[in-house]
């Protein structure tokens, strides 16, 4: 069975092309940089929620802010993994400041097999990043999204 996610990739030309990405939170990602970043995104159930609505909801939940106003462009559907599909929207985020975030949280057993539950931020920081750095930082399944964004803006 395939799981579906939707995400919103903000971009700006500052003067070079940059994207807003977020470092995943929690103990697994704490000491990682390469492959440990993501666009704001999350799961949705096709037929029960529209991908764009899910992308907006996840942006709000993960970053604690509303996405800026503007024209959303669907970049496409990407195979994030063999069992997960990701619908991505692009939005010009010129003027959107990467500050004032209120990161959403999740709970998990920590330390493992301890029987104790701890809360961690879904993401622990977000920032504007040039495309070369973003290609290294993004999780592997999201890297093709950057190529699609470049094609859109060419």
PLM region spans:
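N-terminal strand-loop-strand
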Residues: 1-39, 67, 89
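Short, charged/polar surface micro-motifs in flexible loops or helix N-caps
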Residues: 14-17, 26-29, 45-46, 82-83, ...
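The catalytic Nudix box helix
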Residues: 39-75, 130
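Active-site-adjacent beta-strand/loop module that shapes the phosphate/pyrophosphate-binding cleft
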Residues: 77-115, 127, 149
């Amino acid at each position: 069975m395939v799981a579906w996610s939707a995400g919103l990739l903000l971009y700006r030309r500052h003067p070079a092309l940059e994207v807003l990405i977020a470092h995943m939170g929690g103990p697994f990602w704490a000491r990682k940089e390469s492959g440990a970043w993501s666009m704001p995104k999350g799961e949705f159930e096709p037929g029960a929620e529209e991908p764009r609505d899910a992308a907006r909801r996840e942006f709000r939940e993960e970053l604690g802010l509303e996405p800026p106003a503007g024209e959303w462009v669907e970049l496409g559907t990407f195979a994030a993994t063999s069992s997960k599909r990701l619908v991505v929207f692009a939005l010009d985020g010129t003027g959107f400041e990467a500050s004032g975030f209120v990161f959403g949280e999740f709970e998990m057993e920590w330390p493992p097999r301890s029987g104790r539950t701890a809360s961690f931020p879904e993401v622990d920081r977000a920032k504007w990043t040039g495309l070369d750095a973003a290609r290294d930082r993004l999780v592997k399944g999201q890297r093709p999204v950057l190529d699609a964004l470049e094609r859109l803006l060419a």
